[in-house]
UniProtKB/Swiss-Prot annotation:
Component of the cytochrome b6-f complex, which mediates electron transfer between photosystem II (PSII) and photosystem I (PSI), cyclic electron flow around PSI, and state transitions. The 4 large subunits of the cytochrome b6-f complex are cytochrome b6, subunit IV (17 kDa polypeptide, PetD), cytochrome f and the Rieske protein, while the 4 small subunits are PetG, PetL, PetM and PetN. The complex functions as a dimer. Keywords: Chloroplast, Electron transport, Membrane, Photosynthesis, Plastid, Thylakoid, Transmembrane, Transmembrane helix, Transport. This is Cytochrome b6-f complex subunit 8. Its main location: plastid.
Length: 29
């Protein structure tokens, strides 16, 4: 795996995680 693929994978993980936190925060959990 090259560094570009790793960077994109990490970015997607961080984006998904923060989006989940926002959704959970808005629903009051």
């Amino acid at each position: 795996m090259d560094i570009v693929s790793f960077a994109w994978a990490a970015l997607m993980v961080v984006f998904t995680f923060s989006l989940s936190l926002v959704v959970w925060g808005r629903s009051g959990l």
